[in-house]
């Protein structure tokens, strides 16, 4: 087999009230170069030592669950997606593993099938669907049924503020209530409905307003990310549409006019000097497989 590579974009989830449903692919990437067969799986990477370099690696273990018959290979993994920062690092690894199985096992999976499999692993479709399809996605998992709609948002730019501290998703979910009053659920879902409608109609000011009015999760996570209100205030003053937690946090996700993203990022970097401020774009391609002969040569 000709060596091939897989590129998977990062993602942000929720966009405020679109909890476990709305996702956006971002221009940070996990790259996997698949090299020669081997007696056992070898994962070449320069991440921290806690990231496995064998068949326990999330990419490899996912691939082997999808297609147990695939032969071990040497793979090289690089990524500029920060780990445990709310930017879909684990989702991108799961998606890469599914594509690894798809290619090595000649499964010929459709995009919809990849989304279904990835959602089964992840438990919700927002991050994985965005990484597979690119762009902005709205998804729902109902039992075993996954439904996803993709929309374009090319007029939008993204700024992300990434703190030095990690925040495990399980820890961030632990602060959420186990029960939600009916009247609060009605209010929260109505706001989410307007967010989705505004995304579809490209009414960006309304998108920004709705993404800052979440009731599902952000009020409970403020204790873990206390800078969110001040970042939100500054971003709005600098011309952003809206600000929200990126996934479970701790990163902050800002939607802005595409042409203003650099200026807004620069202004925020001067205020929040203890955080890494990234000017990003929405990735519209999703997962990419490259089978050109020069890969790995």
Swiss-Prot record:
It is an enzyme of class 2 (transferase). It is found in: Cytoplasm. It catalyses: L-homoserine + ATP = O-phospho-L-homoserine + ADP + H(+). GO terms for cellular component: cytoplasm. Pfam families: GHMP_kinases_C (PF08544), GHMP_kinases_N (PF00288). The keyword Flavoprotein does not apply. GO terms for molecular function: ATP binding; homoserine kinase activity. Its EC number is 2.7.1.39. Belongs to the GHMP kinase family. Homoserine kinase subfamily. This is Homoserine kinase. The lineage of its organism: Bacteria, Bacillati, Bacillota, Bacilli, Bacillales.
């Amino acid at each position: 087999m000709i060596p091939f590579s897989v590129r998977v974009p990062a993602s942000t989830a929720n966009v405020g009230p679109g909890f476990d449903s709305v996702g956006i692919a971002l221009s940070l990437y996990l790259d996997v170069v698949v090299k020669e067969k081997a007696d056992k799986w070898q994962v070449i990477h320069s991440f921290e030592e806690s990231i496995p370099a064998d068949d326990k690696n999330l990419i490899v273990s996912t691939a082997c669950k999808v297609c147990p018959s695939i032969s071990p290979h040497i793979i090289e993994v690089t990524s500029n997606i920060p780990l445990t920062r709310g930017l879909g690092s684990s989702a991108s690894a799961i998606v890469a593993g599914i594509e690894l199985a798809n290619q090595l096992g000649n499964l010929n999976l459709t995009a919809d099938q990849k989304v279904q499999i990835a959602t089964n692993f992840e438990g919700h479709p927002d991050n994985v669907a965005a990484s597979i399809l690119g762009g902005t996605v709205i998804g729902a998992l109902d039992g075993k049924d996954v439904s996803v709609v993709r929309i374009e948002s090319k007029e939008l730019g993204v700024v992300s503020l990434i703190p030095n501290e990690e925040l495990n998703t399980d820890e961030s979910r632990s602060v959420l209530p186990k029960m939600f009053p009916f009247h609060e659920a009605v209010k929260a879902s109505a706001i989410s409905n307007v967010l989705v409608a505004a995304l579809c109609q490209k009414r960006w000011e309304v998108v920004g307003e709705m993404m800052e009015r979440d009731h599902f999760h952000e009020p409970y996570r403020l204790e873990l990310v206390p800078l969110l209100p001040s970042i939100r205030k500054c971003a709005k003053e600098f011309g952003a549409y809206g600000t929200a937690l990126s996934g479970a946090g701790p990163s902050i996700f800002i939607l802005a006019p595409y042409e203003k993203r650099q200026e807004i990022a620069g202004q925020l970097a001067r205020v929040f000097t203890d955080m890494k401020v990234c000017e990003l774009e929405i990735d519209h391609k999703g997962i990419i497989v490259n089978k050109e002969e020069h890969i790995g040569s």
